[in-house]
UniProtKB/Swiss-Prot annotation:
Native organism: Cheiracanthium punctorium
Disulfide topology: 48-63, 55-72, 62-86, 74-84, 113-128, 120-137, 127-155, 139-153
Pro-peptide region(s): 19-46
Gene Ontology molecular function: toxin activity
Protein's job: Spider venom toxin that exhibits cytolytic activity by forming an alpha-helix across the membrane. Lethal to insect larvae.
Annotated protein name in UniProt: DELTA-miturgitoxin-Cp3a
GO cellular component labels: extracellular region
Entry superkingdom: Eukaryota
Record has Lipid metabolism as a keyword: no
Free-text description of this protein's post-translational modifications in UniProt: Cleavage of the propeptide depends on the processing quadruplet motif (XXXR, with at least one of X being E).
Main location: secreted
Tissue expression as described in the entry: Expressed by the venom gland.
Sequence motif Processing quadruplet motif, location on chain: 43-46
Alphabetically ordered keywords of this record: Disulfide bond, Secreted, Signal, Toxin
């Protein structure tokens, strides 16, 4: 099991390092019109080379597969000619076969999602994604005045859930001691 976690961590780190990194400093010709620099990046991300397509002109333009980005692999055709095509390394292909299809999140109602720490009791599957991890709707039983139990729900991360659950258990224990 530890080996599987290690393999997953290595695959995640490798995929993070494979993403294209753009220099955010505009070049001298682009200083006059800053919109062209962003437009060029957006156009480059829209036009990617599919698997087995020719990537001789732009070796960083290979499309992403389900999880990982394909690599441009070149081979010598003749003395002075090189042919390049987008391929996926064998071990990355095997990792994708093991992991299978990654299910997509259900679309939120009316194009909006429930923000972090907001009430999600009506829409439990529509929490907004976070920057580092996804939020899930968790519900907690609370004691109101008069020892009446009620349930509150909110979109929280895993760490927030552990902290909140421990806090509610602690308060309930204090209430039971009275």
């Amino acid at each position: 099991m530890k080996a599987l976690y290690l393999l997953g961590l290595l695959a995640f780190l490798y995929s993070c390092s494979s993403e294209n990194v753009y220099d955010l400093q505009p070049e001298s010709s682009e200083e006059e019109n800053p919109g062209t620099f962003l437009e060029a990046i957006q156009e480059q991300s829209r036009t990617c080379v599919p698997r087995d397509g020719d990537c001789t002109e732009n070796r960083k333009a290979c499309c992403r597969s389900k999880i990982f980005q394909d690599r441009c692999q070149c081979r010598k055709v003749s003395q002075d000619k090189v042919a390049c095509s987008c391929k996926q390394p064998y071990w990355l292909m095997k990792i994708e076969e093991i992991l299978g299809d990654i299910p997509e999140k259900p679309k939120p109602v009316e194009g909006k999602c429930v923000k972090k720490h907001h009430d999600c009791s009506q829409r439990k599957n529509d929490c907004c994604p976070g920057s580092m991890e996804n939020y899930t709707c968790k519900c907690y039983n609370t004691l109101e005045e008069g020892a009446k139990e009620s349930e509150i729900c909110g979109c929280v991360s895993k760490a927030d859930h552990q902290i909140l659950a421990q806090g509610f258990r602690y308060v309930k224990r204090l209430h039971d001691l009275r």
